[in-house]
Amino acid sequence: MTVEPLEEPINAEATYEPLIEAERQAAADAAHDNKGRGVLRFYELAKKQEWQVRDMAWGEIPPIPETRAGASDEKKERRRAVWRSVITQQLQADELAVSMAGQLLNLAPHHEAKLYYSTMVQDEARHVEAWLKLANEAGGVAERDPHLDELAKMTLEAETLEEKVFQMQVFFERLIIPRFRLIARSSRGTLLEDLCNRLTIDDGIHHSAGVAYERVLMEDASKQTKDRLVKAANRLLPIFVEHALWRPKERAWIGNVMRETDIRRLQEDVQDGIRMASSLGLDVSDIQLPFAA
């Protein structure tokens, strides 16, 4: 498997060269009124990039960072609990993503999109398998994020395909990429780092494919459909803020220390999403920011 460079920017910009090239080609396809071909490019890339959970170095490297020698048993367990909570949140997200990807596969009317979503369903199921194995290696699971469950429910119950694609792929999949990079940077030499590097690429493809397909959907979208997207964003953003700032009890102290940094990143994430919405032809002037972003 080709992995990305060790020192990456902590943002969502692609650094995996085949993905960068696919994005360039998809943008050119859109400019030449061949948006469906752009979606198909990400199907082809997803097939080439496909990996298996057995490819990871199970039993050869530690699952999570090890506490330094000489630390007390209490400190070791507290540190393991922190990593278990990190793994649990990603497992939860990918369990929900399996359901959402299945919906997209069933609802998409375009052949190219159905092909792509057939790979995305497999990706999300593979991610769940890997997180389940990693959680077991790390000693089990921790507390679920209630706000993430609520966000997933909103996306699953969204009435239009345009809303589902925008919320899951254009918005959420992009936001997780910087988090994977942060986790990987903090867990050198572990299975956790390896998995996060793999998922950075996979979710980058999911996001870019979503942008390409949303262009297809927006081509014939009515003003009413576009207005629904903005209204959905206004319902979603306050819950997204709660999710982004939430910490389980194992990491509550980190949340207090990192609150200013978290809010700054959150503001950047929301502004990024608004720029993305604008680039797809949505009138973002009615989006209500949950804070001074």
Segment roles from a protein language model:
Residues V98-L104, Y117-T119, I177-I183, L195-R198, ...:
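A structural feature that tracks compact, well-ordered secondary-structure segments
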Residues M1-G102, N106-K114, E137, V141-R144, ...:
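Terminal targeting/low-complexity segments that flank the catalytic cores of oxidoreductases
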Residues M100-L107, A130, L134-E137, I183-S186, ...:
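Amphipathic, soluble alpha-helical interaction motifs
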Residues P178-R179, R188-E250:
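Secondary-shell segments that build the walls of catalytic and ion/ligand-binding clefts
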Residues T88-L91, E95, S118-V121, A125, ...:
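Short amphipathic alpha-helical segments with heptad-repeat character
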Residues H110, L115-G139:
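Carboxylate/His-rich catalytic cores and anion/metal-binding grooves
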Residues I64, A93-M100, H127, F172-R179, ...:
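Amphipathic, well-ordered alpha-helical segments in soluble domains
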Residues W131-H207:
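Active-site-proximal alpha-helical scaffolds that flank and shape metal-associated catalytic sites
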